[in-house]
Regions:
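Flexible mid-to-C-terminal extensions adjoining Fe-S/redox cofactors in radical SAM and related proteins
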Residues: 39, 57-128
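Radical SAM enzyme [4Fe-4S]-AdoMet core and its adjacent flexible, acidic
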Residues: 1-58, 62-72, 109-113
Length: 128
């Protein structure tokens, strides 16, 4: 019902882009929950990172894989981001060993996913 409600509204300007992404996100979440699988590629650990208040770096806040602490690396993010720990995490994510409907990761993934961007573009340019 939420998807139908959002799609029933008519938005203008930048709000049309937001609405188009929101509908895609809701559809993505529905698929993830139904299929219990990573339905589009996840780029956590490549395109995004989480930095906890104490300086701990995670590739994804759901997995919370501790890659290291900025304080322990003289605040050198690059040393952590290209360190040894991230290699196994990236392999695991690429192998689709995890899935989640988290908005932070999902919106990043949708911005990199050509089919999603195509659907959003069509909805913005030629709304139904």
């Amino acid at each position: 019902r939420l998807i139908a409600y959002v799609e029933s509204k008519r938005y203008k300007g930048v709000a049309r882009i937001t609405e188009a992404f929101r509908v895609e996100y809701y559809k993505l979440v529905k698929r993830i929950l139904e299929e219990q699988d990573q339905v589009i590629d996840c780029y956590a650990g490549w395109a995004s990172a989480q930095i906890y208040a104490d300086g701990t770096v995670w590739p994804c806040c759901v997995r919370a894989d501790n890659l290291g602490n900025l304080r322990d690396h003289d605040y050198d993010f690059k040393a952590i981001w290209f360190g040894d720990k991230i290699k196994e995490v990236r392999r695991s994510i690429a192998a689709k060993e995890c899935y989640c409907p988290l908005a932070n990761a999902s919106y990043t993934n949708m911005l990199i996913d050509p089919p999603t961007l195509t659907r959003v573009g069509i909805k913005v340019i030629a709304p139904e």
